[in-house]
Amino acid sequence: MWKTDMKRFALVCMLATLGLTASAQVGDYRSEFAIGFSGGINLTAVDFNPSLKEGKLMGKNAGIILRYTCEKYIKAICAIQVEVNYFQQGWKEVEDESSDHFSKTMNYVQIPALARLAWGRERKGAQGYIVLGPQIGFLLSESQEYTGSWMEKERIHTYQYSHNADKSFDYGITLGAGMELSAPKLGHFQIEARYYYGLHDFYDNSSKGYFGRSGHNAITFKVGYLIDLFKSKNPNIR
């Protein structure tokens, strides 16, 4: 399982790199660097095997953005984007009969390295874009919460109540889409949605472990703001 996940992770890294390298060989060259910040909310769950009855756990995200734009190939504006984010994720177990639940929040530092393709205006106006690439994460802390009359002994699976994560390192794949509005002297304003699929299990998935699968997945909504540190002197950029 671990070797298969690493192969998938390496494949996405390679495809993202090759895609940007190929586009950088031809097209309308530019060299622009922007820096900014973003923040928003996450709706997260965990892919458990054996499965648990889950709802979505809401968390927060915030971080910094570094973006290098290198090329416009045909109509696609090609860039590399690296981020450092604080990210809350985890899961929430729910009951049908009541609003009682158990939740575990896991706080990570996440570092996505993304290929970014955009279509539209770069300096003044709107553009749509997509991002795709690998992401790694490092667990900082975790906490859990019970509400109402939640009773551990009444659950089929109870391992997760008394055990923290076995592994602090996480990796997976991120895919997103958004809109950006740019204005001269003001910068770039973004709104974006993303999906993260974790390839790594945070509980021991060996024959000695309880869960065969315990990988994160998250839907993220965020807004961001960037300013240009340097721009290309290219008359074709609009």
Regions found by a protein language model. Give the residues of each.
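Outer-membrane beta-barrel proteins
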Residues: A24-V26, A45, R67-K72, R116-R121, ...
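Short glycine/proline- and aromatic-enriched beta-strand/turn motifs that initiate or cap beta-hairpins
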Residues: Q25-R67, L226-D228, R238
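Residues that define the transmembrane beta-barrel architecture of outer-membrane proteins
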Residues: S31-F33, K56-A62, T105-I111, A126, ...
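Residues on the lipid-exposed face of transmembrane beta-strands in outer-membrane beta-barrel proteins
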Residues: F37-I41, A62-C70, Y86, A113-L117, ...
